[in-house]
Amino acid sequence: MRRTIDRLRLIQIDSVNVLVRAHYMPFFSRLGPYRREMLDELAYRDRYVFEQWAHEACFIPLADYSLLRHRMDRGRRWHSRHLTAERQAYFASVLEKVREEGPAQAGEIEGKRGSKGWWEWSHAKVALEYQFAHGRLAVKERRNFARIYDVADRVFDPQVLETPGHAEADAHRE
């Protein structure tokens, strides 16, 4: 499975679930029957891959973390229109809550329900996703497909976080 991941370099995480969630399917087509838990173990126990936004939410080899640093430094572009001073303060408070109280999913953090946009995400979910897109939070694990966020410092080894990022053009070439 690791060789397949190394060849593909990213696997889109998808909630589509006809037979199994779509991100398990590339391995069936390449490896034949396999234990689906293997991908989850590589992501959440062994940290061979991690979750981050590439074009979509993806599993990416941890060895490629520095290739996405430029994206995390600027965050996702769709966040910028939501950054009022009030929102910035709330986003910071959500990060601090996770830092102080430990891993959390959106439903465990109080916040207003969302509007029709952003899949009706709560304000807490938007804040968690904002911090995740900027690399301050990482996905520690998933429960019933829901992300459990923790501060990146507790999810990844320090040398991963300290590795300098690539320039955007260089990262794209890789």
Pin down the residues of each PLM region.
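Long, low-complexity intrinsically disordered regions
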Residues: 1-174
